[in-house]
Amino acid sequence: MNLLTTRIDLDAIAHNTRLLKNRVGAAKLMAVVKADGYNHGMDRVAPVMAANGADAFGVATIAEALALRATGITTPILCWIWSPEQDWAAAVEAGIDLAVISPRHARVLVDAPPTSRAIRVSVKVDTALHRSGVDEQDWDAVFTLLRDCGHIEVTGLFTHLSCADEPGNPETDHQAETFRRAIDRARALGLEVPENHLCNSPATLTRPDLHMDMVRPGVALYGLEPIPGLDHGLRPAMTWAGAITVVKPIRKGEGTSYGLTWRAEADGFVAVVPAGYADGVPRAAQDHLRVHVNGHDYPQVGRVCMDQFVIFLGDNPHGVTAGDEAVIFGGTGMSATELADALATINYEVICRPTGRTVRDYTGEGK
């Protein structure tokens, strides 16, 4: 028995992958599995995505890319956060595509001695986010440098949208216009760029006019709606739950947890859930959690501790007892989006939180 578990529904992963693939028509689907598959377990979810329509995969780091390749994934893998000081040649030997995210990165690859296989790259152009990416004033130099290098194969260009989760924000169209200008400039200089992509999850779902050659969704694959208030039929794949360890009485006026910041307004019972800030429950979650036990919701009370938090059961009319499952989010509990709203954050962060002593349990067959 595990005291703290994230249940990952592989059938939900399969459903979401198919749904996205069906929405994008002829465009390819690059499934983003960075951060260990958004904390769902990259080694388990990536094969399901591959079997249900993913044409390629995107990760952040070289270590993630190599780990993904080691699972047996044979489709293209793009890595977009790396340093020239790393052993990037190991990624090339493993057939990993590297993102050119600055002129320096381009120069390092061009000046490198030939490897046993061509270095495959995708050029990330900065179209407004002002993060990683080649700035417009450097396009000509970088495009020409790559064009003239015999041991580099350019797969295309990509960029990242800053405001796609805000439908109607003109910045998305401004970025798309800049991106098209980058594609046109590359081709005018004689650089072949066959596969170009800019759509993240919200743009994949709401901007079919921007699908281009490939889309690059992330959070939607895991069943979370990237645009507040919309419903695209996605199925959340993660449920985070703990097994109650203690149920005990509390008298009116008595407090619980550090500082006794909460006191019972009437006699009743409290229960202890074995999840704390060491496991990803933020200390700031105090008084924001509604925990689901046996078909009923109960408020979290008092301060969140390192290893546990407390819920108030009232007079415990439903007979909650030690060993019962307490759902923190997902499944029958609060959705990740509801919890994110309560914590003034985003659902992306919420699903990345279960860590520490949390054990993953997989359900479904990925079909």
UniProtKB/Swiss-Prot annotation:
Enzyme class: isomerase
InterPro entries documented for this protein: Ala_racemase (IPR000821), Ala_racemase/Decarboxylase_C (IPR009006), Ala_racemase_C (IPR011079), Ala_racemase_N (IPR001608), PLP-binding_barrel (IPR029066)
Catalytic activities: L-alanine = D-alanine
Pathway: Amino-acid biosynthesis; D-alanine biosynthesis; D-alanine from L-alanine: step 1/1
GO biological process: D-alanine biosynthetic process; peptidoglycan biosynthetic process
GO cellular component, one term: cytosol
Active site: 34 (proton acceptor), 258 (proton acceptor)
CDD domains assigned: PLPDE_III_AR
Keyword annotations of the record: Isomerase, Pyridoxal phosphate
MF term (GO), any: alanine racemase activity
Keyword set includes Isomerase: yes
Binding residues for substrate: 131, 306
Modified residues annotated as N6-(pyridoxal phosphate)lysine in this record: 34
Annotated family: Belongs to the alanine racemase family.
Function recorded in the entry: Catalyzes the interconversion of L-alanine and D-alanine. May also act on other amino acids.
Protein name, entry field: Alanine racemase
